[in-house]
């Protein structure tokens, strides 16, 4: 670090989740080094914290193979330009936030030029395409990992990795207020309540909604007072879910919510959800759950051969055992889903034990991630 200029940190975030992480990291760094300079690819939150944006984050936020191919020339141009400009700027450190397909190659380019690099948020190398770990090891000086089993994986391959905890675990209380959440959603305190979360992608909602609704119908037979809340991520998914409901369960009364997934989880006695980040959030909300997931047969066949983990849901990966019931493919059908949910709705020994384990796991990954990340960046930069 030269005397005549402030600590200079280059960052690239490629989507909203990365923008949130980047903003938290910049905030924590500014507390320690008030005159630090931040520059790179940033979204609105990072820019609000003072990051100078050479490119808008939206330029990188492309989903799906067709969209990526359509934008490939532009993406390659941006990466080449950043390699050149960061090479000239010689920042004290580069932090690639998630977006591994874009960032890991960029990190490798910069490391060759003598710039220290950090990759913030491990891709799921522990689950599939494990050989990527070697490329990550060559490209980065340090990986910042949200979860302890990720660090254990990198340690096995001698790739420097630091477990910093999960920002979502920092943001959510250890003991959520169920009744307050019910008041917000208009759910009586004494009713049984089930949350249905059929996924955030169109393909998931299409595959899972009908069986999730049929499961709720079966549970209503045992619990006639059952309140059913269905948070949907946007208007498109809501429209899709309403169409499926009109065909499958037109008479089933449910509360459709725009967003509010977290409130729905906190308010509910049990949740039925697709896998993914929602399962982690549900664990942190202390809501007992069943994971139901189905994909096209060929995709599942392929996934079974590629995925190297025993479980699909993060609570089970964290616990190292089947804490949460996972019903996949042909197992994901109404009778089996309802049978797995019944003991959770009874709010007895099963759900209490699950709740206690969720709380222990929450404490394990609640480490003040923004502060930990900032500390790691400064240690490497100086």
Swiss-Prot record:
UniProt xrefs under PANTHER family: LIPID-A-DISACCHARIDE SYNTHASE, LIPID-A-DISACCHARIDE SYNTHASE, MITOCHONDRIAL-RELATED
Gene name for this UniProt entry: lpxB
Tagged with keyword Lipid biosynthesis: yes
UniProtKB keywords: Glycosyltransferase, Lipid A biosynthesis, Lipid biosynthesis, Lipid metabolism, Transferase
UniProt protein name: Lipid-A-disaccharide synthase
Pfam families: LpxB
Class of enzymatic activity (EC top level): transferase
Function noted in UniProt: Condensation of UDP-2,3-diacylglucosamine and 2,3-diacylglucosamine-1-phosphate to form lipid A disaccharide, a precursor of lipid A, a phosphorylated glycolipid that anchors the lipopolysaccharide to the outer membrane of the cell.
GO biological process: lipid A biosynthetic process
EC code: 2.4.1.182
Native source organism of the sequence: Escherichia coli O8 (strain IAI1)
Any one GO MF annotation of this record: phospholipid binding
InterPro entries membership: Glyco_trans_19 (IPR003835)
């Amino acid at each position: 670090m030269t005397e005549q200029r402030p600590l200079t940190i280059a960052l690239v975030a490629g989507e909203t989740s990365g923008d949130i992480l980047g903003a938290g990291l910049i905030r924590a760094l500014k507390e320690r080094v008030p005159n630090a300079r931040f520059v790179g690819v940033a979204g609105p939150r990072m820019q609000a914290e003072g990051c100078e944006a050479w490119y808008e984050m939206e330029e990188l936020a492309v989903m799906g193979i067709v969209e990526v191919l359509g934008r490939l020339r532009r993406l390659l141009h941006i990466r080449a330009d950043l390699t050149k400009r960061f090479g000239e700027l010689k920042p004290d450190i580069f932090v690639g936030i998630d977006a591994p397909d874009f960032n890991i190659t960029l990190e490798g380019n910069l490391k060759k030029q003598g710039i220290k690099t950090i990759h913030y948020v491990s891709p799921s190398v522990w689950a599939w395409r494990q050989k990527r770990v070697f490329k990550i090891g060559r490209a980065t000086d340090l990986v910042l990992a949200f979860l302890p089993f990720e660090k254990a994986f990198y340690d096995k391959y001698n790739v420097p990795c630091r477990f910093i905890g999960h920002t979502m675990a920092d943001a959510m209380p250890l003991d959520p207020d169920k009744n307050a959440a019910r008041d917000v959603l208009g759910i009586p305190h004494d009713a049984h309540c089930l949350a249905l979360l059929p996924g955030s992608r169109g393909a998931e909602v299409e595959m899972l909604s009908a069986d999730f609704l049929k499961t709720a119908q079966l549970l209503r037979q045992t619990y006639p007072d059952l309140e059913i809340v269905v948070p949907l991520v946007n208007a498109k998914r809501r429209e899709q879910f309403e169409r499926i409901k009109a065909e499958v369960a037109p008479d089933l009364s449910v509360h459709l919510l725009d967003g509010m997934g977290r409130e729905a989880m906190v308010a509910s006695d049990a949740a039925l959800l697709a896998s993914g980040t929602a399962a982690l959030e549900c664990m942190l909300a202390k809501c007992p759950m069943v994971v139901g997931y189905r994909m096209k047969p060929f995709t599942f066949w392929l996934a079974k051969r590629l995925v190297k983990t025993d479980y699909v849901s993060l609570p089970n990966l964290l616990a190292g055992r089947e804490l949460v019931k996972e019903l996949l493919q042909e197992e994901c059908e109404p009778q089996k889903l309802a049978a797995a949910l019944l003991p959770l709705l009874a709010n007895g020994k099963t759900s209490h034990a699950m709740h206690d384990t969720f709380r222990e796991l929450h404490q394990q990954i609640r480490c003040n991630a923004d502060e930990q990340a900032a500390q790691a960046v400064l240690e490497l930069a100086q």
